[in-house]
Amino acid sequence: MPKLSIVVAPDERLTTRASEVTGINDKIKELVNDMFETMYNAEGLGLAAVQIGVLKRIFVMDIQLEDIKGEPVGYESTGKFCMINPEITELSDEQVILKEGCLSIPEQSHEIRRPKYLTVKYKDLNNKEQTLKASGWLARCIQHELDHLNGILYIRHLSKLKYDMAMKKAEKFKRHYER
């Protein structure tokens, strides 16, 4: 299957809340496979369906970074996942600031403050309800991709001035590459 095109900001699809997936069928499974292929081809860690123009509550991710020492027992910090209709049920009070990037905002990265740990409920490709306790980059990626499903770009977590500068840079990038 050919890789899918990634939607680049500014684009109204990236600021639109995605709708719930009502059933998992072969079409959804094929979409998920194409999303993984697209994510790997773009060398990303995660990809939300809205980033390929599909306004459904699905994202994929593959975090194979080194485990962070000192993470609490029972929390995952690596793994390959497809999350359908995800919902964060618990966020830690403890927060951490790390640099993030995004396939939909190329050639930029910004320091973003996010909760360090979380619990998320979601459906897998077998339509089974799953619960995951996540930490480290896995927790960060879940929050980043879930923001996409809610129509929020990660740069929205910046100050207004930094957000405006990031959007101007994104607009310039998009104009340059659309020629």
Curated annotation (Swiss-Prot):
List of catalytic residues: 145
The keyword Coiled coil belongs to this UniProt entry's keyword annotation: no
Binding-site list for Fe cation: 102, 144, 148
Biological process, per Gene Ontology: translation
Pfam families in alphabetical order: Pep_deformylase
InterPro entries xrefs: Peptide_deformylase, Peptide_deformylase_sf
Catalytic activity: N-terminal N-formyl-L-methionyl-[peptide] + H2O = N-terminal L-methionyl-[peptide] + formate
Cofactor descriptive note: Binds 1 Fe(2+) ion.
GO molecular function per UniProt: metal ion binding; peptide deformylase activity
Keywords noted in UniProt: Hydrolase, Iron, Metal-binding, Protein biosynthesis
EC number, UniProt record: 3.5.1.88
Enzyme class: hydrolase
Cofactor(s) required for function per UniProt: Fe(2+)
Coiled-coil ranges per UniProt: none
Protein's job: Removes the formyl group from the N-terminal Met of newly synthesized proteins. Requires at least a dipeptide for an efficient rate of reaction. N-terminal L-methionine is a prerequisite for activity but the enzyme has broad specificity at other positions.
Family designation: Belongs to the polypeptide deformylase family.
Protein name: Peptide deformylase
Gene name as annotated: def
